[in-house]
Design a protein with these regions (language model features):
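Extended, low-complexity cationic-aromatic segments
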Residues: 1-90
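C-terminal anion-handling pockets and recognition modules
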Residues: 10-14, 21, 147-219
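Acidic/histidine-rich, metal-coordinating catalytic segments
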Residues: 17-19, 101-118, 141-145
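Short aromatic-enriched loop/helix-cap "lid" or pocket-rim segments at secondary-structure transitions
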Residues: 26-30, 122-123, 147-149
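RNase H-like polynucleotidyl transferase catalytic core
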Residues: 42-48, 111-114, 128-149, 163-165
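Short, basic/hydrophobic alpha-helical segments
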Residues: 85-109
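Short, aromatic/basic amphipathic alpha-helical patches
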Residues: 120-130
Length: 219
């Protein structure tokens, strides 16, 4: 495996990127119910979490490298390959230049998953044209991207700090704008220690991936 000998410091020069969908309603928390044996067939309304349908959501793109976060970009429209390329042009390049100036845009290693918009021909052509060094990402292990854990922190903090998020008034556009504003506040407050912890875990993640022969791991 190409990156098996990377240290945490080596991993700090990888630009991890991803998209995330955040819903108006908090459906990210797991609830456990413990019942006595004689009550296992009974249904208690207070123990049932209703499923929210047609909840307004907002898609966002973000990135980080080392202990530095990039911008959190709302994608109000459906993400196409063209939209994705525009995001890279307008936000990724400037982030790399500001964060990794000694490497430069064309020496930084860029990570993306295998989403269709990322693997589209025009996206691949753009990356080749711009001479980006793209990390080969294992197809069966999305859990290898530490930004997934950053998304979990983002969502958890959103609903903790803004518990009325599920009651945001207005139509789809108004709710998406309110979500974007709140998420920007939460994103800004995620400190460097969080990213450092994720980067420090990368050698262990890689070893776990090797042990799992490329399949899913505990991460």
């Amino acid at each position: 495996m190409k990156y098996k000998d990377f240290t945490a410091e080596d991993w700090s020069y990888i630009v991890f990127t991803d998209e995330v969908s955040v819903k108006k309603s908090d459906d990210v928390t797991d609830f456990w119910v413990f019942r006595r044996l004689r009550e296992r067939e009974k249904c208690f309304p207070e123990q049932v979490k209703p499923k929210t349908r047609n909840s307004v959501s907002l898609m966002l793109w973000g990135c980080f490298a080392g202990c530095f976060k990039g911008p959190l970009i709302p994608l109000h429209d459906t993400e196409t390959a063209e939209v994705y390329i525009q995001v890279l042009q307008e936000h990724l390049v400037s982030f790399i230049l500001e964060t990794l100036p000694e490497n430069g845009v064309f020496d930084a290693i860029f990570q993306q998953d295998n989403a269709p918009t990322h693997k589209a021909h025009i996206t691949q052509h753009y990356l080749e044209q711009q001479e980006f060094v793209v990390m080969q990402f294992p197809p069966n292990s999305p859990d290898m991207n530490p930004i997934e854990h950053l998304w979990a922190v983002l969502k958890k903090e959103l609903y903790r700090r803004f518990p009325d998020t599920s009651d945001l008034p207005g139509g789809r556009g108004a709710v998406q704008r309110a979500l974007a504003e709140r998420l920007a506040i939460v994103w800004e407050d995620i400190g460097p220690d969080t990213m450092n912890t994720l980067i420090d875990s990368m050698p262990r993640r890689v070893q776990a991936l090797i042990d799992a022969k490329g399949w899913y791991t505990k991460y």
